């Protein structure tokens, strides 16, 4: 018997918003009777940008900026029709990117 599975990947720059969104998704799926695996924390992507402080000279004086992308993975096993409808109607904060695979 083949199992249906929905895989949801969440990405955000702020981990608090990301965790709140993951909790909303888990709570909604549990309320509609689906099995949940997660939220699983994935490795944080760290991007470092190095720029010169001065516009013309002083090459040794530099400044570094960092951007961290936090990620979570949620698997919903054997979702019901109610689960899919509830997830479509769910509103999440604007700072969270969602990728859904069926």
Curated annotation (Swiss-Prot):
Coiled coil ranges: none
Pfam families in the cross-refs: Ribosomal_S10
Entry annotated with the keyword Glycosyltransferase: no
SMART domains documented for this protein: Ribosomal_S10 (SM01403)
Keywords: Ribonucleoprotein, Ribosomal protein
Keyword Protein biosynthesis: no
Subunit note: Part of the 30S ribosomal subunit.
Described function: Involved in the binding of tRNA to the ribosomes.
Family the entry assigns: Belongs to the universal ribosomal protein uS10 family.
Name this protein carries in UniProt: Small ribosomal subunit protein uS10
Species of provenance: Leuconostoc citreum (strain KM20)
């Amino acid at each position: 018997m083949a199992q249906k599975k929905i895989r949801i990947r969440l990405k955000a720059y702020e981990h608090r918003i990301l965790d709140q969104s993951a909790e909303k998704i888990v709570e909604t799926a549990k309320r509609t009777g689906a099995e949940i695996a997660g939220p699983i924390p994935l490795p944080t992507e760290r991007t470092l940008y190095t720029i010169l402080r001065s516009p013309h000279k002083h090459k040794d004086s530099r400044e570094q900026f960092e951007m961290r992308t936090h990620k979570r993975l949620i698997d919903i096993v054997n979702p019901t029709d109610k689960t899919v409808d509830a997830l479509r109607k769910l509103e999440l904060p604007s700072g969270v990117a969602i990728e859904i695979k069926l």
